[in-house]
């Protein structure tokens, strides 16, 4: 979040990013991350 502001970007609501498990027995690894855009971005 702060890192995004240092670059002069705009921060948006968090987005859930999921990565498949390394094994068939594992669950999906999901974590919330800030969705950031560069300064001057339309979204």
UniProtKB/Swiss-Prot annotation:
A GO molecular-function descriptor: toxin activity
GO cellular component: extracellular region
Subcellular location: Secreted
Record bears the keyword Secreted: yes
Cystine residue pairs: 4-36, 11-30, 18-37
KW Disulfide bond (keyword) present: yes
UniProt note on tissues of expression: Expressed by the venom gland.
Keywords in alphabetical order: Antimicrobial, Disulfide bond, Ion channel impairing toxin, Myotoxin, Neurotoxin, Potassium channel impairing toxin, Secreted, Toxin, Voltage-gated potassium channel impairing toxin
Main location: secreted
InterPro entries reported in the protein's UniProt record: Myo_ane_neurotoxin_sf (IPR023355), Myotoxin (IPR000881)
One BP annotation, GO: envenomation resulting in occlusion of the pore of voltage-gated potassium channel in another organism
Binding partners and assembly: Monomer.
Sequence similarity: Belongs to the crotamine-myotoxin family.
Described function: Cationic peptide that possesses multiple functions. It acts as a cell-penetrating peptide (CPP), and as a potent voltage-gated potassium channel (Kv) inhibitor. It exhibits antimicrobial activities, hind limb paralysis, and severe muscle necrosis by a non-enzymatic mechanism.
The protein's name in its UniProt record: Myotoxin-2
